[in-house]
């Protein structure tokens, strides 16, 4: 059984612990105040890029939003055990979650990379809002087909294909056509 993580609640708690108001967080992260508010109230499922920007402003690693436990040493993620699942989207409401992230590093303290298995659900969308953030991403397709818009290029990846790119370039990852896909993604976001 997977456990739900309230990303918005963690962001609000961290922001308040730093005695920072929403307007300051919005300005420093270069995100609209309305978006910060919607994320904190769990009315908007954020994309990965806004989360990385918020994490940098709050002085925490991306993983801080994704799990509760912190451990020293090696962390083993077993297939049969529950994994942290977080739903992300690039859409305007929580009803349109198109990606379900399963953390493979839950509990690892001071990590520098974020490995995920991501279930990508079909959206029917044709126009995608590309985003960028500091860091690098590696994607390996486990099942299905995935389309990656990267800068002005579009790459179609099938099972067994991979792509590695600088995430400062505007990009978007989504399923191809109307089928689901599953990927292994490793995200590095400098702290």
Each predicted region: which residue ranges?
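Recognition helix of helix-turn-helix/homeodomain-like DNA-binding domains
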Residues: 31-46
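Short, conserved beta-strand element in jelly-roll/cupin
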Residues: 119-121, 132-148
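Short amphipathic recognition helices of helix-turn-helix/homeodomain-type DNA-binding modules
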Residues: 64-74
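Short basic helix-loop element that most often maps to the first helix and adjoining turn
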Residues: 9-26
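Short acidic-glycine-tyrosine-enriched beta hairpin
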Residues: 104, 151-166
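Conserved short histidine dyad/triad with adjacent acidic residue
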Residues: 82-91, 97-107, 115-133, 167-170
């Amino acid at each position: 059984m997977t456990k739900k993580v309230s990303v918005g609640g963690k962001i609000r708690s961290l922001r308040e612990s730093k005695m920072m108001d929403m307007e300051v967080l919005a300005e420093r992260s270069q995100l609209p105040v309305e978006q910060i508010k919607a994320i904190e109230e769990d009315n908007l499922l954020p994309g990965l890029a806004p989360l990385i920007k918020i994490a940098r402003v709050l002085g925490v690693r991306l993983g801080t939003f994704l799990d509760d436990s912190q451990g020293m040493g090696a962390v083993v993620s077993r297939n049969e055990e529950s994994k942290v699942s977080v739903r992300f989207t690039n859409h305007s409401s929580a009803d349109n979650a198109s990606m379900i992230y399963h953390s493979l590093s839950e509990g690892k303290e001071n990590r520098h990379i974020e490995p995920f298995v991501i279930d990508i659900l079909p959206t029917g969308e044709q126009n995608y809002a590309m985003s960028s953030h500091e860091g690098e991403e590696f994607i390996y397709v486990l099942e299905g087909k995935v389309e990656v818009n990267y800068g002005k290029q579009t790459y179609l990846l099938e099972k067994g294909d991979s792509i590695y790119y600088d995430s400062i370039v505007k990009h978007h990852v989504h399923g191809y056509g109307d089928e689901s896909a599953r990927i292994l993604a490793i995200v590095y976001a400098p702290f």
